[in-house]
Design a protein with these regions (language model features):
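Hydrophobic alpha-helical membrane-insertion signals
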Residues: 1-29
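Anion-binding and metal-coordination hotspots
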Residues: 4-5, 72-85, 95-455
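A generic, residue-level signal for flexible/boundary positions that often mark functional hotspots
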Residues: 12, 16, 38, 42, ...
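Generic alpha-helix structural propensity
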Residues: 13, 22, 35, 39, ...
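Basic, short loop/linker segments at the boundary and entry of helix-turn-helix/winged-helix-like folds
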Residues: 24-66, 71, 373
Length: 455
């Protein structure tokens, strides 16, 4: 007999518990086990007034944002609607069935105010990272570093002209304040400057049109693929390499974690960065060297010249010396250029009578060999590249790329919603926090978590 859902009389009272309706294998249940925000109120207390009406609970807002970043809900308007309707989201946010969900404008007001001043998102990221460290998911044996370009919320067709008025938006004010600060990193001026987000960098994408973008820089522990630090920069290679120093030193300062080796691509193989790794931090560089000295026209390359470190000179294939100076100065000179290199030159007389001149310096009267002041660190990287361990670590570089792919394809962070470098930093911190929470749910959960509506 066909059944019916009609009942003679509806019950007057219901016994309802949110915990009973959320499945035990739900992703948010696993994440909730590893998310401890008990210290958040104490961290934010100096940024709240002691008088006036009570504000929205900051832990509630953080939990709602984490739902959005963990499950790819990019719009805060939609996030508020989803939390209002979804019982699992209410359970994760500690809301009862009758509690009111905050308005979407609450997030904007707090983000541009006390959350940014207190670095609340950095605090939450480090709380989750500390939980990963205590759970043994971060070993510190090796870190992999890489950067990925993410489109900014800026139109490609609109850029600043010299006679334009900048206006007064938050991203504009942040940019103008940054111009007044001293910048220790030399970066070429951008070709175009966005009118709405001037800190975004005009970037040429391979195989596609250029666009305004920021770079998210990840420092990842190669053990379990945990993001140990993240830094937002304009999309420029020099700034990306500089951010790696910031992340390594910050991790060392706050968690006393010193890595033994750093894995990266050719962008991190500059002489200065290798010198910092080897000489200052005693980090083993698993990085391809940025070589410029090898020639392909049949003439002698720099590797064909032997360097005597004690005597400080090169010896050419014809057994002649290349030295820094051919005469003495009253005041000793270092010979170090602005590019942190030293030029070694041969004698004109030796080169004029040399039978190998056509293979060495056919178009110049003498041969010049340039040596970096960090050449000893480059030699260390060359020796590391010959080891079997280096071949293994090359495969581990993919861990960072997989996280970037997960960020853009699954978590939907392929275009930023917030403007300015601070807005990019907020989004990248929340994304990395969500990825670490999902990692813990995967490795430390009691069973495979079920992610609703996602691949």
């Amino acid at each position: 007999m066909m059944g019916s859902s009609d009942t003679p009389q509806k019950p007057f009272f219901y016994a309802f518990n949110l915990d009973d309706v959320v499945p035990q294998d739900h992703l948010l249940r696993h994440i909730d086990r590893f998310l401890d925000l008990s210290d958040l109120r104490q961290h934010l207390e100096p940024y709240y007034s002691h008088t006036g009406r009570p504000s929205v609970d900051p832990e509630l807002m953080i939990r709602m944002l984490l739902i959005g970043y963990c499950l790819g809900i990019r719009s805060e308007r939609r996030l508020c609607e989803e939390v209002k309707l979804n019982l699992a989201y209410r359970w994760f946010c500690r809301l009862s069935i009758e509690d009111k969900v905050p308005d979407h404008s609450t997030f904007s007001k707090n983000r541009h105010g006390r959350f940014r001043e207190a670095e609340a998102f950095r605090f939450v990221f480090e709380q989750v990272l500390e939980r990963c460290i205590n759970a043994g998911l971060v070993s510190g044996e090796g870190f992999a570093v890489d950067a990925s370009v993410v489109k900014a919320d800026a139109s490609r067709q609109r850029h600043h002209e010299d006679d334009d008025d900048w206006g007064g938006g938050p991203a504009i004010r942040e940019y103008l304040e940054g111009l007044e600060e001293d910048d220790t990193v030399a970066v070429a001026p951008p070709k175009k400057v966005s009118h709405s987000d001037p800190q975004a960098r005009w970037t040429a994408a391979p195989g596609g049109p250029a666009f305004y973008a920021y770079s998210t820089n990840y420092l990842v522990d190669t053990g379990a693929g945990i993001v140990v630090d993240v830094e937002a920069t304009p999309a420029h290679r020099t700034l990306e390499v500089q951010s790696t120093r910031t992340m390594i030193e910050r991790l060392e300062d706050r968690f006393a974690i010193k890595t033994k080796k750093l894995i990266g691509d050719t962008a991190y193989g500059t002489a200065e960065f290798l010198g910092w790794m080897v000489n200052d931090k005693a980090i083993e560089p698993h990085v391809p060297i940025w070589e410029k000295g090898e020639r392909t026209d049949g003439t002698f390359s720099r590797s064909d010249f032997d360097f005597d470190e004690e005597a400080d000179h090169y010896t050419c294939p014809n057994d002649k010396r290349l030295v820094r100076y051919r005469r003495k100065f009253k005041q000793p000179r270092s010979g170090i250029t602005k590019a942190n290199t030293i030029n070694y030159r041969s004698s004109r007389h030796d080169c004029a009578a040399c039978p190998m001149k056509q293979r060495c310096c056919a178009k110049t009267p003498y041969r010049k060999v340039t040596r970096s002041v960090y050449e000893s660190a480059r030699d260390v990287a060359r020796e590391v590249a010959k080891t079997p361990a280096y071949r293994r670590t090359r495969r581990q570089r993919k861990q960072v790329e997989m996280l970037f792919g997960h960020m853009k394809r699954i978590l939907k962070v392929d275009r930023l919603r917030l403007r300015g470098l601070s807005g990019a930093q907020d989004e990248f911190l929340l994304t990395a926090t969500a990825q670490n929470l999902r990692r813990m749910a995967k490795y430390l959960g009691t069973g495979p978590p079920v992610v609703p509506g996602m691949a």
